[in-house]
Design a protein with these regions (language model features):
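Compact, glycine-rich, soluble single-domain proteins
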Residues: 1-121
Length: 121
């Protein structure tokens, strides 16, 4: 699976360095199902996606919703299993991160993210 590094250009910080890209129907369908946790610096970028659910998941995640220009449209910190994030036609992709990442990295609505190919993908 392709991997990217995610930067917050607004804050000049690195959000995560090991983010898998779910850009096919099957990869989007499977998502994080079957995993017991997300490691620090890991994540899943689901594109296209107008929102996510955590049905069948075993752990909470931070969810960052992005518009088509990779600007943060909404955040859902600590989305627990068996929940649904907000859904909007303005959301183009969704970034799933370990719980606590939004707070630790100071991620806020309106921030501009950049996705760079990881060195070893």
């Amino acid at each position: 699976m392709k991997q990217v590094t995610v930067l917050d250009k607004t804050r000049a910080t690195t959000v995560a360095t090991e983010v898998a890209v779910a850009d096919t129907f099957l990869r989007r369908l499977i998502g994080l199902l079957g995993r017991r946790r997300l490691d620090a610096e890991a994540g899943l970028w689901i594109r296209p996606s107008s929102g996510v659910h955590t049905f069948g998941m075993l752990f909470a995640i931070d969810v960052v919703a992005l518009d088509r220009h990779h600007r943060i449209y909404a955040v859902w910190p600590g989305l627990r299993p068996w929940r649904i994030s907000g859904v909007s036609w303005k959301i183009h992709s969704v970034l799933e991160l370990p719980t606590g990442t939004i707070q630790q990295k100071g991620i806020e609505i309106g921030d501009q993210l950049e996705f760079l190919p990881s060195a070893f993908t």
